[in-house]
Amino acid sequence: MRVESGSAQERGILLESLSTLLEKTTASHEGRAPGNRELTDLLPPEVCSLLNPAAIYANNEISLRDVEVYGFDYDYTLAQYADALHPEIFSTARDILIEHYKYPEGIRKYDYNPSFAIRGLHYDIQKSLLMKIDAFHYVQLGTAYRGLQPVPDEEVIELYGGTQHIPLYQMSGFYGKGPSIKQFMDIFSLPEMALLSCVVDYFLGHSLEFDQAHLYKDVTDAIRDVHVKGLMYQWIEQDMEKYILRGDETFAVLSRLVAHGKQLFLITNSPFSFVDKGMRHMVGPDWRQLFDVVIVQADKPSFFTDRRKPFRKLDEKGSLQWDRITRLEKGKIYRQGNLFDFLRLTEWRGPRVLYFGDHLYSDLADLMLRHGWRTGAIIPELEREIRIINTEQYMHSLTWQQALTGLLERMQTYQDAESRQVLAAWMKERQELRCITKALFNAQFGSIFRTFHNPTYFSRRLVRFSDLYMASLSCLLNYRVDFTFYPRRTPLQHEAPLWMDQLCTGCMKTPFLGDMAHIR
C-alpha cells in the first residue's frame, strides 16, 4: 500500500525512526548498547574511521613526482614556535600602549588569555566588533564580541541593517584588509586580537569615550613595535629550546628532499641574523648548503607584486653589498628583491615548484593565482581540531545534529498543532547541539574551519590558495617523495545519491521527484 506524502501513517514512521535513534544515542551516551549496537552504528562505515592529525590533506590533485623545487617561509613553517611566545607579545605590546601611547594604567591588569580568540576572525573597526564570518559573508550568530563581552544576535543584525550579511565592499580585500573590516590571518595575530579586545573592554567598562579607528591603530602599532624593534627575535634567540619546536623534524625534511635531488629555497620576511641562529639550532652550522637560494627581509606580499625592488647580497657579517645581482648563488644570502627577478634568474616556474607557508595571503595567494606554483599551507591548529573531531563526544553531537536536520526537513510537511510542537522542540535541541559542538573547539568562536554548517571565510581562502594543507612541515615525512595526493570528491548538494542526515536517521528516502511532490 502506497503511503501518501503528509499522511498520518508516514508521520508515524518518521516518529518511529526518531524513537529508534533516540534509543541508540541515549544508550551510547550511557555506555550501553541495545542489541550490541554502538553510536558508530548510526554512521555510514566510511565516516567511522578516525582522522590522522599527521596526515596531509589535498584541495587539489598534486603529484610530488612532478615537483623539482621546494620553497619555504621561515616563521611557523620551517620554525614552529611554542604558544609561550604569545603572552610575551601581548604583555609587551600592552606595556607599550601604556608607557608610549599613554593609555590608562588600568589596562595593565589584563593578562593574555590563550582560549579567547582563534585565527581567521574579522574585526569591524568602526563597530569594535570581533566576529567569525562564513564563506558566504554571513556573521555566525553567537560569535560577535565587543571587548570581552558577547554582542546579542539582535544587535548584530541591527548593526548591519537587519541582516547577518556583510557586503562585499566592506569585506577584507585580496590581502585581508578592507576599508573598515580586517581579517586576522596569521598566528601572530592571536595576541593582537586579545589585546584589542582587552583595551576595548577597559574603555567600555569605565565609560570612556574613544575613537574606534584610533584605538585600533594604536593597538596594531604597539604589536608592530614588538616585531619592528626586534623584541620577539631577542626572546627566541635567548631561549631557542623553549620557543622553537620540532627542529629535528625540520632537519629531517630538508635532508630527505636534498638526498632525493630536490632544489630548495627560502623566502622570509625575517632578518638574516635571526634566521641564521634559528637554522643553526635546528639544522646545524652548514644549513645554507641545503638551500640553492636564501632570501631574507623579502617584504612579502609586495615581494610578489612590486618589480622595483632589486636583490641585494649580504656578506658573511650581514652587511649589504653594492654589486649588481646577475645570478643567485647557492650558499649566499640575498635581501629584498622581487619575484619577477627571482623567476628570471632561477627559471623556476609553474607546477614544478611547491612553496610552503603559514599565511594564506602573504605567502600563498599570489603564487597560486598569478604564477601557477603549487602551494602548501601550514596550519598548526589542524592537529588539535582533528583530535577533537576524533572524540566520541564530537561524533555523538554531530550525528544527532545531522539526524535532527533531516527530521526537521521532513517534518515541515505536517501542519497540525502536534507536529508544529515537535518541530519547535527539535529546532531548539538542534540549536543547543550546535552550540555544544562549537564549544568543543573554542567557547567563544568555535572551529577555525567551520561555522555551524558552512565553511568559514578562513576555510574558503585555505581551499582557494593552497593545494595541500597540514599541521606541520614534518607531515611530509609520512609520504614518499613521489606520492600523489588525491582530493576526495565532495558531492554537491544536487549530486548526493543519499542525504547523510537520512542515513543517520534511518529514513532512507532520497529526494527524488516522486517523493517531493509537495514541492512546486
UniProtKB/Swiss-Prot annotation:
Its keywords, alphabetically, are: Cytoplasm, Hydrolase, Magnesium, Metal-binding
Q: Where does this one sit in the cell?
A: Cytoplasm
The protein's matches in Pfam families, at most eight in alphabetical order, are given as: 5_nucleotid
What terms describe the molecular function in GO for this protein? 5'-nucleotidase activity; metal ion binding
Annotated GO biological processes are:
negative regulation of catecholamine metabolic process; negative regulation of dopamine biosynthetic process; negative regulation of oxidoreductase activity; negative regulation of peptidyl-serine phosphorylation
Q: What is its EC number?
A: 3.1.3.-
GO CC, sorted alphabetically, is: cytoplasm; mitochondrion
Which CDD domains does this one have?
A: HAD_cN-II
Instruction: Give a yes or no for keyword Lipid metabolism in this entry.
Output: no
Similarity field: Belongs to the 5'(3')-deoxyribonucleotidase family.
Function, as annotated: Promotes dephosphorylation of tyrosine 3-monooxygenase TH which decreases TH catalytic activity and leads to reduced synthesis of catecholamines including dopamine, noradrenaline and adrenaline. The exact mechanism of activity is unknown but may act as a phosphatase or promote the activity of phosphatases or may inhibit phosphorylation by acting as a barrier to interfere with protein kinase access.
Q: What is this protein called?
A: 5'-nucleotidase domain-containing protein 2
Q: Which organism is it from?
A: Homo sapiens (Human)
Lineage, opening ranks:
Eukaryota, Metazoa, Chordata, Craniata, Vertebrata
